[in-house]
Regions:
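FIC/Doc superfamily catalytic core
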Residues: 1-196
Length: 196
């Protein structure tokens, strides 16, 4: 049976388990567009919070706090690592270890000038999405975290196609295609998309 709230609108969306679905806080939400709107309000508030303070994006506690700020008014599990398998991401038991390795790698890239600011931020974003630490909201969380990192490194915010990447439209498909190219070790399409 179809569920207008939780059925994936495209094959790149992360499905939630029944237990995760029970974590929905607002009782008025019955349709996908209502969920998207409620989440967007939290994302905008988290954006103002994160850019309005001193922060270290490469701190695990900051990243979990950022996710909680983004989705905490909508989902009880916001800011908590997922505990179940997914169609994307590392095994749940590896999330903490892989995230720690990512943060160490990014610190190394920055300290040794391995990549420019944009490429550091985009590679950080890609790896964060690939880890997929949370039940949902990973792409939006990783884009905001990458924006924060770019600014922390002295660059401008990334533009990510200048469109809503939640809706399954042409721009979202270009983003997903660029992520998949990065999965195959071709970062150029994602780097280009991040500045379009």
């Amino acid at each position: 049976m179809s569920d207008p709230l939780f059925d994936a609108e495209d094959d790149a969306a992360t499905p939630l388990t029944p237990e995760e679905r029970e974590g929905l806080i607002p009782t008025y939400i019955t349709l996908r567009h209502e969920l998207n709107e409620a989440e967007q309000i939290g994302i905008e508030e988290a954006d103002r919070w994160a850019f309005g303070r001193k922060r270290d994006v490469l701190d695990e506690r900051f990243l979990t706090a950022l996710h909680k700020r983004m989705f905490g008014q909508v989902w009880r599990w916001a800011g908590q690592y997922r505990t179940t398998g997914r169609n994307i991401g590392v095994d749940a038991y590896r999330i903490g270890m892989d995230l720690h390795q990512l943060l160490d790698d990014v610190r190394y890239w920055v300290a040794h000038g391995t990549y420019g600011a944009d490429e550091v931020a985009v590679r950080f974003h890609h790896r964060l999405v690939a880890i997929h630490p949370f039940p949902n909201g990973n792409g939006r969380h990783a884009r905001l975290a990458a924006d924060l990192l770019a600014v922390q490194l002295g660059a401008a915010r990334l533009t990510w196609g200048r469109a809503n990447l939640v809706e399954p439209k042409e721009t979202r498909q270009a983003y997903v295609t660029a992520l998949r190219a990065a999965d195959d070790h071709d970062i150029a399409p994602l780097l280009a998309f991040a500045r379009t």
